[in-house]
Every structure is written in structure tokens, then in C-alpha cells.
Amino acid sequence: TDTALMADLHLKIQPGTDVMLFNAMLHVMMQNGWLDMAYINKYTEGFDAVAKGLVDYTPKRAASVCGVPEGDIVTAATWFAQSNRTLSLYCQGLNQATTGTDKNTALIALHLATGQIGKEGSGPFSLTGQPNAMGGREVGGLSTLLPAHRELNNPAHVAEVAAFWGVKQISATPGASAVEMFDQLEQGKIKAVWVACTNPAHSLPNSQKVARALQNAELVVVQDAYLTPATVQYADVLLPATTWGEKEGTVTNSERRISRVWPAMPAYADSKNDWQIVVEFAKRLEVELQKLGVESPRLGNTSNAFMPY
């Protein structure tokens, strides 16, 4: 890659061996006394178990598994631990993998163990893979996370979000992942799916299973700016969305700065911003729910819940 060509040290590891590399680096740091024990004792839990598990992760073993020289692993560990500021930039190679959680955890452990986190110029910095992916997380775009980085497994956070939404309670049970969702769609456990800003018939693993799931669904709604995505052919309802140059709202960029975005041109024909489509649907749903005696939530101001806004 262009970045690798400019690197002072390129660790050209075998695919899928990231965790071995990171653990070996932490092993080197531990053996040389380069850990920030004051930070570890004050801000982390479970370090003794981690240290015990690192005994066999020698740089020699990692070199044979990862396919890189042992000396390069030691060099990487040295630079990481002894630099005044260490910043890790990573993207889909760590995030979108069958062991993605393990990869992220191992890298973050390097920062926690050396205190290279929570200060200017340091920290694990996930770039994510799509524009405004971070913005989606901030407003609750994940099935396992509440808005404004509130955790589902924290009762205080759940109560806080419920109060903000103006409802008595919300489910603290994490939702399904994208793969799990389509498994349940195929099995009939999920009856309907609303696809927005993605193309699962093309991008999800096991495309044949995804196709069967979409065919089995009682209702498929696709919200997209184009007619060409593979998922469109399964749509019962197609909602025309605007492209990036026609949208207004906010975007959270790679440095986590939130920017106000204005459209460069008017929306084409009857297309609407994604958020406008959701709001219009919610208004219509509210009318139907009121007929059933369901009380409508009263939302608070976003900036009151999430200070960056």
C-alpha cells in the first residue's frame, strides 16, 4: 500500500495473525519493564490474568506464526512503549473480521498497558470504513449500543435514555448483528426488514443465504439513492433517498469532530434525506399506535444528551 511504502517499519504479517503480533509486543513490553503500572493499577482491571496469559507469546513464536522477523516485533514494541506519544490508526482489517473483537481488544490492551491513551496525540484510533460511521454510533445506530455511547448493560444508562425518550422503560437486551438478523429472517423469526444505507445482498457473507432470507421475508423495505444495488430486486417498498451532496445534517469525521453539513444542490425529484424518511414514517406510525392506545414518546434535545452536539 502507499502507507506501507512510506513506513519506517512494515510488519507484513500473515492474514489473521494480528492478535499474535499484538500479544507478542505486549510480552516484550512486560519483559522489559516498559508498562505503566501506575496507569494500569488506577484505570484497568484484570491485568494479572492478562500477564499470565502472555507467557507463551514470545516474539520468536510470533515471528514463526506471523511471518515477520523476530527483531521487527521487538522494534515495534520498543517504539510503541517508549515513544512520548503513540497513536494507532486502524480500519476494516481489524474491525470487519471473524476475530475483530479480539483484534481490537489486543491493540487497545497495548495502549492501556503503556498509558498511551487519554492524552493528546495518543490512543487507539479507529478510522472506520464509511463516511460518518462514527456519527451513526453516536446517535444509536448499533443494535448493541444506546445513543451517545450509553451502554446497554448499564442500568443507569438504560434509565437515562428511557427518560430522554419519554418512555417508562426500554429493552436492555442487545439486538442481533447483521448476520444474525438475516439468519433470523431466513428462519421466519424476523418478518420484515428495512434496509437503508447498505447493500446486504452484495456485502454480507453467504450471499445465497441472504437472498433466501430476503425472499422469505414478508416485507422488505429498501431505502436507497439508486436502483442498481443488488438488494433492490427484493424490495416490496422502495424509498428514494438523497445522495451526499443533497443532504443536510451533521457528520462526525475521523478526528471525531462534528461538522454541520449543508446541501450543495436540491434533492432530486421526490427523494428525501434518510432522516426525513424515518421522521415521516414515525409520524404515520404514531397515528396508528395512538389508535391502539400506545403513548407517544416525547424526545428531549440531542445536545442535552450528548455534549459534542
Question: Which residues make up each language-model segment?
Answer:
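Cofactor-pocket helix-loop regions in the catalytic cores of large enzyme subunits
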Residues: 1-132, 136, 152-309
